[in-house]
Amino acid sequence: MGKIRRLVLDVLKPHDPSIIRLAEELSDLPGVEAVNISIYEMDQRVENAKITLEGDDVNYDEVLKVIVESGATVHSIDEVVAGRMIIEDAETLQDPLV
């Protein structure tokens, strides 16, 4: 089975723990080489975050465990890249013109 190389998640998280702490915990997981967390919306109690993880063998179940233990929930899996290498999206006719 191919290994997950990149995982992009839409997550709803409380303000605590901070994104710094969450990124540190996620980056400590085996198979994870890099973590990026961006907050794109915030209200009084929660933050909406885009979490991107890259590595040579990202384990979704372990990632989910860290996220849930932090009090957050995964809204959606927005991108998955698996296989021997990472490929970027290719532009298609369905993509809007910019």
What are these regions, as identified by a protein language model?
Residues 1-98:
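Long, contiguous binding/interaction regions
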